[in-house]
Amino acid sequence: MIIGLTGGIASGKSTVVEIIKDAGYKVIDADQLVHDMQVKGGRLYQALLDWLGDGILLPNGELNRPKLGQLIFSSEEMRYQSAEIQGKIIREELAAKRDCLAKEEDVFFMDIPLLFENDYQDWFDQIWLVAVSPQVQGQRLMKRNHLSAEEAGMRIASQMPLAEKLPYASLVIDNNGNIDDLKKKVKGAIKDLANLV
């Protein structure tokens, strides 16, 4: 059984991943995979360099991630181009990791932030969605990423609205409360999962 885990930016998904890992389940992290491929010499690093030129690099040759983020989130056209350029490479690499882990584990998770936006739904037996109100999401994003309200709003607006994701979720994990509430909900879901398998 493969479970897709998703949620909007600053929804608390990373905390959910830690709880799942603590329960002994393996989690493929799409963000980490992207990060690894964006290091100097990686597949995405080269694709981004070919697209945007060396203005996105730091003096040491590494990607200037804040500048890259600002560029990509600056317009819908840039986001679309980024998805086109990086999407195919990311899908290939995630599929390879998924197929490899499926040989070793009966049940595992894949943490994919843009699961619905990039049409990964058919990869999964279940989809767990971490949900948070736009107000809480905005506050957390501004605090975590040191963004202005406008920048946070642009990033949130670039993702599919929560209401459109809800019908596709097997499980919705409400994370508008505190960390203890979240742990209780996730541990309950994991217990239910263990009874299913």
Swiss-Prot record:
Gene Ontology molecular function: any one: ATP binding
UniProt xrefs under PROSITE patterns: DPCK
GO CC list: cytoplasm
UniProt binding sites for ATP: 10-15
Compartments it resides in: Cytoplasm
GO biological process, one term: coenzyme A biosynthetic process
Domain of life of the organism encoding this protein: Bacteria
Entry EC no(s): 2.7.1.24
Catalytic activity, reaction form: 3'-dephospho-CoA + ATP = ADP + CoA + H(+)
Positions of the DPCK domain: 2-197
Keyword Cytoplasm set for record: yes
Keyword Transferase included in the entry's annotation: yes
Pathway: Cofactor biosynthesis; coenzyme A biosynthesis; CoA from (R)-pantothenate: step 5/5
Keywords: ATP-binding, Coenzyme A biosynthesis, Cytoplasm, Kinase, Nucleotide-binding, Transferase
Main location: cytoplasm
Role according to the record: Catalyzes the phosphorylation of the 3'-hydroxyl group of dephosphocoenzyme A to form coenzyme A.
Family classification: Belongs to the CoaE family.
Protein name: Dephospho-CoA kinase
